Design a protein with these regions (language model features):
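Short, charged beta-turn/beta-strand-edge "cap" motif at the junction between a beta-strand
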Residues: 57, 98-101, 170-180
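Zn2+-dependent peptidoglycan hydrolase active-site motif and core
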Residues: 71, 95-152
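Short, compositionally biased
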Residues: 107-116, 183-194
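Acidic, glycine-rich catalytic/binding loops that coordinate metals and/or anionic ligands
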Residues: 36-38, 125-127, 156, 162-165, ...
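Short, small/polar residue-rich loop motifs at catalytic or cofactor-binding pockets
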Residues: 79-81, 130-131, 156-157
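A structural signal for short beta-strand/turn segments enriched in small hydrophobics and glycine
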Residues: 91, 161-173
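Polar/charged, compositionally biased leader and regulatory segments
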Residues: 1-99, 211-235
Length: 235
């Protein structure tokens, strides 16, 4: 179910970028429903989005079996895993981290219980255990940065100091860090230091959006935030 934009929930300003992927992706979390979108301001996630790739039937992976209810699944099973990701902005790469493993995926509530109980342990492990493999880009025109996290191990294609254009491939979607299934977490912030940065709004220049129901019509959106629960794609 799609959320409705709540007037005044997301302030003006921030960053305007391009969707960083091809194909159809479900907006799992968005600041259109609540701020902070992830329930916390920690690590500059105030206005962050979570996107997960879906097929024409709206599934993130092939239809689940009984095994998926009781056991984790390989991340390679999911449509998002390994999908190319592109820089949403022109700018300079200021920070990268690679080498964190891609975890098994957990679709059911039952399989997520032990993962949730281990959350404090991951936080104590330090910053890499939360975003996993990630890239942070300083926006060329402005003081802000954009971070893409939970990338696939070994997929990061840029290094600090590299200049990128919007649309350049920079990595692939993975399941590293604090992630239960392959997805892209993307956010804008006022500095590249995830420990001290504050989140700022992120909007996308132009994209198509529809409700998740099969056959739902597409609507063109400009300089706005994808709604939580909506499927989005390039224009």
């Amino acid at each position: 179910m799609m959320s409705r934009n709540i007037p005044g929930l997301i302030p003006e300003g921030g960053v305007i970028g391009k969707l960083p992927f091809d194909g159809q992706w479900l907006t799992e979390r968005s600041p259109t429903r609540r701020v902070p979108s992830h329930g916390t301001h920690l690590f500059a996630t105030t206005y962050a989005f979570d996107f997960v790739a879906v097929d024409d039937d709206g599934l993130t992976a092939p239809a689940r079996s009984m095994r998926a209810l009781f056991a984790p699944e390989p991340p390679e099973l999911f449509h998002a895993f390994g999908r190319p990701l592109y820089s949403p902005v022109a700018g300079t790469v200021v920070s990268v981290h690679d080498g964190e493993p891609d975890h098994v995926a957990r679709r059911s509530v039952l399989t997520r219980i032990p993962y949730g109980l281990s959350q404090p342990q991951r936080i104590r492990q330090g910053l890499p255990a939360i975003p996993g493999n990630h890239i942070i880009i300083q926006v060329a025109e402005g003081p802000h940065c954009v971070g893409l996290v939970h990338l696939q191990r070994g997929s990061v294609q840029v290094s600090p100091g590299d200049r990128v254009s919007a649309g350049d491939q920079i990595g692939r979607c993975g399941n590293s860090g604090n992630s239960t299934q392959p997805h892209l977490h993307i956010q804008a912030m006022d500095s590249p230091d995830l420990r001290t940065a504050k989140g700022v709004p992120l909007r996308f220049e132009e994209f198509r959006q529809r409700s998740p129901q099969q056959g739902a019509p597409w609507a063109l959106r400009r300089q706005s935030c994808p709604e939580q629960g909506a499927v989005v794609a390039q224009p």
